[in-house]
């Protein structure tokens, strides 16, 4: 069984074709600049050279046609016919309260996704465009929606409700939803597998640390709390996002800087985080170089970042009544030994202690804590595409 996984953005489309018999990636690629000049598809099939296909793509439907043609091309394709595609799994950012698990896409599901678009105006519309374009081109192939928010629908009310007038929740569904759920679920399950313990017996804190970042408390295999909230802005300090802050700052800035809500949103989402603090970059590699050169603001950015992650780890250990494993994943979590070390320093009271030799590794599935500590620290590369493919396979 071969499953095509798609992640549609506003002007891009990432894809993987996976053979589910052995979970081998048969092809991987990216369509970019959809709807604008310079559109192209970067495509690579297993065992073949990378190719770049430069061709106008007026919309997602055109892009998907080009991707499918690349997949069956006799020179650089991965399959002989589109008939080999058993299903398409789509990443969908926001499922609201409606979807607590992945679903086969129907007209009813598409209508519900449109209703959720107010909650994720930048992400859900292109996700839906990708689904509809695939349905037109592959009308007999099942489509499955896999939601970033679904894993967190198990959170109790005490975790997801804001202390605002309850009527605002009833009227506008203002509550905490959480994101990165597919990644958090994948690494939590993988941690249980590595530790050779039932997931039902484990209290896991999963740290997804990329340019966007979130932490989830996973108790017995279910999400009981997570750092992102109504939007992906809440929680940790990120590459360009501020994370937690006093909400009164919003109206203060509007008054003092004479700016509107869109401009404040841009500041909080695109000009803040380690980029705003350091004045250097949103890329942690650049910030680490600046620190070595003696840049104090770059050091401050890292200090604030590490402290915020530590606070959440401590809070979630308290919430779950302990912690058996802390997992680091995503770009920074997987590839920065210094980040893992700095976050874990001072957490010995939770049974957390890094082994510096074991920790000196990047992008490899491994345990990086000392052998004698009760709480295990793991590095687990996330694989959201495989997780989406597995969810898709389970539904068809």
Swiss-Prot record:
Requisite cofactors: Mg(2+); Mn(2+)
Signal sequence extent: none
Keywords annotated in UniProt: ATP-binding, Cytoplasm, Kinase, Magnesium, Metal-binding, Nucleotide-binding, Transferase
Protein name as catalogued: Acetate kinase
Sites where the protein binds Mg(2+): 7, 384
Binding site for ATP: 14, 208-212, 283-285, 331-335
GO molecular function: acetate kinase activity; ATP binding; magnesium ion binding
Note on cofactor: Mg(2+). Can also accept Mn(2+).
Annotated site location: Transition state stabilizer: 180, 241
GO CC, any one term: cytoplasm
Cell location: Cytoplasm
Functional description taken from the UniProt entry: Catalyzes the formation of acetyl phosphate from acetate and ATP. Can also catalyze the reverse reaction.
Positions of disulphide bridges: none
Alphabetical GO biological process terms: acetate metabolic process; acetyl-CoA biosynthetic process
Binding partners and assembly: Homodimer.
